[in-house]
């Protein structure tokens, strides 16, 4: 079954044991091995080994000694995967986003690459004593790839967050209830394109208003219960592939004027509306082209000023 659902994606690799040409290790989502030169395979990842494997070191001097790097960190085995040690001393979590609420003490929220969304008090003291007390100060509130987090400033128990490709929900931390808020295209309409890190934004002017980016900008005035698409396609259009392209990557609402909204896309487009989405203008024509708009921040002092960051590392442009 390990082969059936696996794919290479960008991290799939194959290794051959340096001392045994019939011993093969291959990995992508699972970590599997063969003892007969690839005729048969079996899984060697165990319950404490995270999926999505990126690297493997095979000890040339000690058969069965492996060090595995995966989306959950580092695991070590001395018996060829029968038992694994989880290396918890290596801090390798990668945050996609961070936010805070207004409680006292305030909580910090973080969306982590393939390790979900976590929250905890800002004054939590890092300590391994929780292993004895059982009281870990940080709490997981969502799984998958943890993406953006928006907290209702009127009620900090209401949190909007989600995982990859735009699967966001409205969480009630007090009751544990969760409701999907993802916009859905109409019958006969082309499906929306959602970025891996789909942007969302709660309005600072009205916390019932939520903005959601696909290749369009969507607006809800009832906390994500219903949606209105308030723009045309704000990208250059999609491209064929297994990962959506031509998608919005960032949204910024002016803290001065609720009708002024900016969007940025993965293909370098920055748009502005000054009338709440009735009309839009491309303001990126004089910028370097085809770069990823990584973040937009509307000025708190002048509604006509926007701060933008663009990157091109995906095209080796540093």
Report the location of each language-model feature.
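Beta-propeller blade termini and top-face loops
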Residues: 1-318
């Amino acid at each position: 079954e390990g082969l059936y659902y696996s794919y290479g994606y960008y991290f799939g690799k194959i290794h051959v044991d340096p001392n045994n040409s019939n011993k093969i290790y291959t990995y992508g989502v699972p970590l599997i091995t063969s003892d007969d030169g690839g005729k048969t395979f079996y899984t060697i990842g165990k319950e404490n080994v995270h999926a999505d494997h990126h690297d493997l070191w095979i000890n040339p001097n000690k058969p069965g000694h492996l060090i595995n790097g995966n989306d959950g960190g580092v695991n070590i085995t001395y018996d060829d995967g029968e038992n694994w040690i989880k290396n918890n001393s290596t801090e390798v979590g990668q945050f996609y986003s961070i936010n805070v609420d207004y409680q006292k003490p305030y909580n910090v929220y973080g969306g982590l690459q393939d390790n979900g969304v976590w929250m905890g008090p800002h004054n939590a003291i890092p300590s391994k004593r929780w292993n004895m007390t059982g009281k870990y100060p940080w709490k997981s509130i969502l799984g998958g790839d943890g993406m953006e987090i928006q907290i209702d400033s009127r009620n900090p128990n209401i949190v909007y967050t989600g995982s990859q490709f735009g699967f966001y929900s409205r969480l009630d931390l007090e009751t544990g209830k969760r409701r999907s808020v993802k916009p859905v295209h109409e019958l006969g309409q082309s499906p929306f394109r959602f970025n891996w890190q789909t942007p969302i934004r709660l309005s600072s002017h009205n916390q019932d208003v939520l903005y959601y980016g696909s290749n369009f900008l969507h607006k809800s005035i009832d906390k994500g219960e219903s949606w209105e698409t308030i723009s045309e396609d704000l990208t250059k259009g999609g491209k064929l592939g297994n990962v959506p392209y031509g998608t919005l990557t960032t949204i910024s609402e002016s803290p001065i004027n609720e009708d002024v909204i900016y969007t940025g896309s993965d293909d370098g487009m920055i748009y502005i509306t000054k009338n709440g989405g009735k009309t839009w203008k491309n303001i990126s024509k004089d910028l370097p082209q085809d770069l990823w708009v990584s973040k937009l921040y509307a000025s708190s002092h002048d509604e006509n000023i926007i701060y933008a960051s663009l990157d091109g590392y995906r095209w080796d442009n540093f």
